[in-house]
């Protein structure tokens, strides 16, 4: 249709008596977004008609060429012009900046005989749009210094540069300039300010600017919705969306994409379905690929994999974004085979796709598959990201594969990670390295990584404190906790679990009591069930059984099987059969089918020689239909897995194993003679055998 309109205007070029009709034709090319071929057609006619030396038509030709995709032709017109005016220079500079030829634009800018407001705005806007935001700010500062009037285009462009740099200090300075200008009430400037504060993570100021706006358009609402969706709380994004609808502002695809993303992060499936219904009724948006991708992602994250697959299959064009969302969705649904099939069928993969499947395997405990896929990623010359390494280190940690973890560490170093925040935030790669080393028992290596990190967050401190605690370095854990407080890092509930666990393993009862009682007062961390479990374990290990029992009974939440089990184990260690029987009954109320309480209680009676009570416990087990599953252990030696069951006598080295068992039992209980050792219950013998087999192979 646009081509026909152009041809109609160009029907009789030879009859044109001045250059104005040619200018109209060139405007038609620009407005209709025609290719440069049509501009060349007009250009040839201009030359034939004898108007090619008019500066007016030459300027229009430069403008048309640059806007229709052939800046080279426009530059040739510019270079051949005997005379140029400010419009001529601006047309070329604007064309260069819009197409990203920024260095060439800068060179031309510096050679201009004069500049005006339009010239400066083109430079600020062009550099901001192409992510050279520092230079955009410099041009803006020079423009202001040289006394040029700043208008709405100047402010919008420089705010975009501040957003690109996440530089709120500069943004605030620009905001104060705007406050002194006539543009504070401009709806586009208001929207740009909301967006700037949003991108800088300042939700409060974004909301304040929005609230102060006299007029708002769809861009204003989108900026605030996106602010909450990206910075949180995401539920506020849904509230703002509801206010937008009540204000009768029609949402566009940007609005809906942000709302769908908020629904995904909140698992707000009902609101997401309502938005989906709105889109289905809108012919214009129904097949929008961005919205389709967002819906696939939302349904996948909400564990509605069937709905996600339905939308995916309905998409006229599928891209890597939708396919990656499906991979993540299948992984969340524990369908790693379906995720791998989707991955295999992808025509095009990016590193995000690889990361999604690697993460899926680690989330589902298929760590060997994750490691294998990472090796394939390397063979196919895909450059891993910080997220790739974080997942692969998690797999190594879960498998306790120190050798592979160290290889992954070498790859991390080769990729130049510095463990600091920024555009590529890789602090959590350092955190993953710490976690891997401490879980593999290499606390010193984990601590070395911790000390070499250029920046640390709360997770870094937590990983190291818990690593110390779990590996028996109680003093070091508490010392590091004190250092954490001195650094100004605020502890969270995970930190306090590590601290209390360290006290428990080291037997620091008074310190544990102190830190538990000061959690809320000093750090604003209300004790959770896990903190009570740590305290019960601490008190139980130290023999303060009644205090541990009182703590459980005074908990503000219902005790679970873990906390009762911890106290029951302590009762066995300290041979408190009366309390042990009470705790076992409480534990069975929580988990009636758990064989653990029966076995521990039976062993306690056996240790005291109360064989009739042992038989009664066993009868109760049979009566309740509770059976004890045989234990299974394994160990990797020189790359080979050795697996064995309780009472398993099939191992080729069983004689050496049982000989060592006798020696170890004698060492473990030197104060008892062999007649006492012979009275060990079968469960205790099984348990000791397991320990021995681990050490003998």
From Swiss-Prot:
InterPro entries: E_motif, Pentatricopeptide_rpt, PPR_At4g14850-like_plant, TPR-like_helical_dom_sf. Gene3D superfamilies: Tetratricopeptide repeat domain. Keywords: Repeat. Pfam families: E_motif (PF20431), PPR (PF01535), PPR_2 (PF13041). PROSITE patterns: PPR. GO terms for molecular function: RNA binding. GO terms for cellular component: mitochondrion. Residues 563-638 are annotated as: Type E motif. Residues 639-669 are annotated as: Type E(+) motif. One of its GO terms (biological process) is mitochondrial mRNA modification. PPR repeats lie at residues 18-53, 54-84, 85-115, 116-150, 151-185, 186-216, 217-251, 252-282, 288-322, 324-349, 350-384, 385-419, 426-456, 457-491, 492-527, 528-558. NCBIfam families: PPR. Belongs to the PPR family. PCMP-E subfamily. This is Pentatricopeptide repeat-containing protein At2g13600. It comes from Arabidopsis thaliana (Mouse-ear cress). The lineage of its organism: Eukaryota, Viridiplantae, Streptophyta, Embryophyta, Tracheophyta.
């Amino acid at each position: 249709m646009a081509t026909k309109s152009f041809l109609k205007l160009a029907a009789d070029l030879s009859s044109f008596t001045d250059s104005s009709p040619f200018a109209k034709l060139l405007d038609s090319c620009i407005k209709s977004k025609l290719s440069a071929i049509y501009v060349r057609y007009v250009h040839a006619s201009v030359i034939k008609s004898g108007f090619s030396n008019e500066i007016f038509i030459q300027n229009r030709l430069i403008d048309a060429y640059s806007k229709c995709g052939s800046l080279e032709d426009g530059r040739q017109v510019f270079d051949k012009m005997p005379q140029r005016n400010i419009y001529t220079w601006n047309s070329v500079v604007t064309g260069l900046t819009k197409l990203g030829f920024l260095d060439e634009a800068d060179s031309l800018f510096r050679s201009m005989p004069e500049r005006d407001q339009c010239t400066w705005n083109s430079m600020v806007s062009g550099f901001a749009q192409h992510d050279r935001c520092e230079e955009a700010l410099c041009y803006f500062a020079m423009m202001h210094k040289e006394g040029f009037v700043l208008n709405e285009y100047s402010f919008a462009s420089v705010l975009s540069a501040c957003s690109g740099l996440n530089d709120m200090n500069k943004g605030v300075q620009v905001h104060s300039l705007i406050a002194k200008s006539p543009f504070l009430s401009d709806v586009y400037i208001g929207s740009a300010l909301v967006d700037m504060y949003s991108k800088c993570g300042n939700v409060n100021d974004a909301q304040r600017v929005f609230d102060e706006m006299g007029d708002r358009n769809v861009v204003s609402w989108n900026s605030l919705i996106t602010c909450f969706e990206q910075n949180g709380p995401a539920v506020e994004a849904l509230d703002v969306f509801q206010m937008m609808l009540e204000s009768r502002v029609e949402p566009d695809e940007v609005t809906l994409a942000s709302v769908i993303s908020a629904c995904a992060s909140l698992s707000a499936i009902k609101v997401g379905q309502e938005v989906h219904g709105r889109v289905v009724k809108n012919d214009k948006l129904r097949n929008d690929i961005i919205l389709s991708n967002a819906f696939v992602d939302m349904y996948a994250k909400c564990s509605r994999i069937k709905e996600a697959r339905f939308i995916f299959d309905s998409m006229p064009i599928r891209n890597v974004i939708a396919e990656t969302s499906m991979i993540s969705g299948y992984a969340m649904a524990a369908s790693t085979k379906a995720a791998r099939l989707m991955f295999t069928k992808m025509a095009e993969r990016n590193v995000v796709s690889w990361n999604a499947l690697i993460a899926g395997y680690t989330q589902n405990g298929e760590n060997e598959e994750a490691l294998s896929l990472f090796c394939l990623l390397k063979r196919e010359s895909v450059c891993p990201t910080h997220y790739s390494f974080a997942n692969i280190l998690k797999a190594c940690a879960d498998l306790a594969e120190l050798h592979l973890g160290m290889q992954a560490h070498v790859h991390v170093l080769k990729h130049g990670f510095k463990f600091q925040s920024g555009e590529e935030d890789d602090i959590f790669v350092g955190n993953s390295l710490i976690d891997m080393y401490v879980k593999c028992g290499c606390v010193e290596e984990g601590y070395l990584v911790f000390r070499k990190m250029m920046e640390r967050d709360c997770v870094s401190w937590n990983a190291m404190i818990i690593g110390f605690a779990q590996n028996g370095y109680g003093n070091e854990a508490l010392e590091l906790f004190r250092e954490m407080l001195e650094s100004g890092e605020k502890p969270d509930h995970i930190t306090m679990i590590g601290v209390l666990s360290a006290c428990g393993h080291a037997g620091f009862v008074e310190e544990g009591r102190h830190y538990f009682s000061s959690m809320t007062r000093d750090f604003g961390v209300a004790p959770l069930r896990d903190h009570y479990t740590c305290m019960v374990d601490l008190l139980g290990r130290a023999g303060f059984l009644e205090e541990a029992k009182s703590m459980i009974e005074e908990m503000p939440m219902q005790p679970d099987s873990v906390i009762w089990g911890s106290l029951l184990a302590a009762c066995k260690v300290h041979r408190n059969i009366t309390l042990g029987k009470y705790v076992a009954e409480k534990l069975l109320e929580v988990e009636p089918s758990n064989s653990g309480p029966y076995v521990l209680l039976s062993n306690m009676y056996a240790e005291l020689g109360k064989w009739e009570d042992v038989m009664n416990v066993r009868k109760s087990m049979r009566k309740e239909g509770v059976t004890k599953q045989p234990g299974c252990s394994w160990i990797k030696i020189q790359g080979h897995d050795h697996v064995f069951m309780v009472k398993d006598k099939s191992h080729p080295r069983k004689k050496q194993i049982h000989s060592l068992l006798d020696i170890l039992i004698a060492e473990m209980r030197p104060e008892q003679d062999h007649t006492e050792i012979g009275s060990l219950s079968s469960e205790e013998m099984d348990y000791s055998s397991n320990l021995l087999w681990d050490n003998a192979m």
